[in-house]
Curated annotation (Swiss-Prot):
InterPro entries xrefs: Aldolase_TIM (IPR013785), Arch_ComA (IPR022370), ComA_synth (IPR003830), ComA_synth_sf (IPR036112)
SUPFAM superfamilies given in the database record: (2r)-phospho-3-sulfolactate synthase ComA (SSF102110)
Parts of the chain that traverse the membrane: none
Domain of life: Archaea
Function: Catalyzes the addition of sulfite to phosphoenolpyruvate (PEP) to yield (2R)-phospho-3-sulfolactate (PSL).
Organism: Methanothermobacter thermautotrophicus (strain ATCC 29096 / DSM 1053 / JCM 10044 / NBRC 100330 / Delta H)
A Pfam family recorded for this sequence: ComA
Organism lineage: Archaea, Methanobacteriati, Methanobacteriota, Methanomada group, Methanobacteria
Name the record gives this protein: Phosphosulfolactate synthase
Listed NCBIfam families: arch_ComA
GO biological process: coenzyme M biosynthetic process
Gene name linked to the record: comA
């Protein structure tokens, strides 16, 4: 039983179909990662090993962390940039084999940096699904100049293509900063016209909005509801985000209904 549980609005337990929280692991040690799970695993659904961090760590350490996360009912997966590097080097089959041997059951397929045409990306999603992986795809470009070339209708088309190819959910690119990328302006504010265009046309239960900033998290929760799917959450902000979801923080107190 949690402290003050009589003051805590209930929320759906895991495995959740909505209200997903994805957290970014940029290289935590096993002890720190376990401490994090001990205090906050109930509020985390996915944890992403950021970009290309995994090749810098020992295989036994990576496997230990993968197994540990899963023991807390948290699904770990490698960041999409690592997949793009594998594709660039014509090592996709080897990438799948290594991911499986390390214990990963979920992969991210993206084309945010490496040029992978939509048709090829969809083929790779299908390939990963056929290999037995759950796939999270990502839509958007890492380079703000390239990302700005995507109109809202382009994002809708790309999301739909990924879902048809077999992606379970689609991440909307915002990078670690949440600024000057995707639906965010240079200050991290949401471009509301673009946001509304996407929410009117896409299934919200299949979208994970990357929202590293607190103001962005509050916006999504007030606009879509506490069961909105949010990603790229810093590890130290897991509990804070959960309080926002439940109306246990001034930003949403009395404004959310679970």
């Amino acid at each position: 039983m949690n402290a003050f549980d009589f003051l805590t609005p209930p929320r759906s337990g895991k495995p959740r179909k909505n209200g997903i929280t994805m957290v970014l692991d940029k290289g935590m040690g096993p002890a720190s990662a376990r401490d994090l799970m001990e205090i906050s695993s109930d509020y985390v659904d996915f944890i992403k090993f950021g970009w290309g961090t995994l090749p810098l760590h020992r295989r036994d350490t990576v496997k230990e962390k993968v197994d540990m996360y899963r023991s807390f009912d948290v699904e770990p997966y490698p960041g999409g940039t690592l997949f793009e590097i594998a594709h660039l080097n014509d090592k996709v089959e080897e990438y799948f084999q290594e991911a499986r041997s390390l214990g990963f059951e979920t992969l991210e397929i993206s084309n945010g940096t490496v040029e992978i045409e939509t048709e090829e990306k969809c083929r790779l999603i299908e390939m990963a699904v056929d290999e037995g992986f759950m796939v999270l795809s990502e839509v958007g470009k890492k380079d703000p100049e390239r990302d700005r070339l995507l109109e809202p209708d382009d994002r809708v088309r790309l999301v739909r293509a990924d879902l048809r190819a077999g992606a379970s959910m689609v991440l909307m690119e915002a990078r670690e900063s949440g600024q000057n990328i995707g639906i965010y302006d240079e200050r991290g504010n949401i471009r509301e016209d673009e946001f509304n265009h996407l929410t009117d046309r896409l299934p919200m239960d299949r979208i994970i909005w990357e929202a590293p900033q607190k103001s962005q998290q509050v916006y999504f929760i007030l606009k879509i509801g506490p069961d909105v799917n949010l990603g790229n959450i810093p590890p130290e902000e897991i509990t804070a985000l959960e309080t926002i979801r439940r109306g246990l923080r001034g930003d949403t107190l009395g404004k959310v209904n679970l």
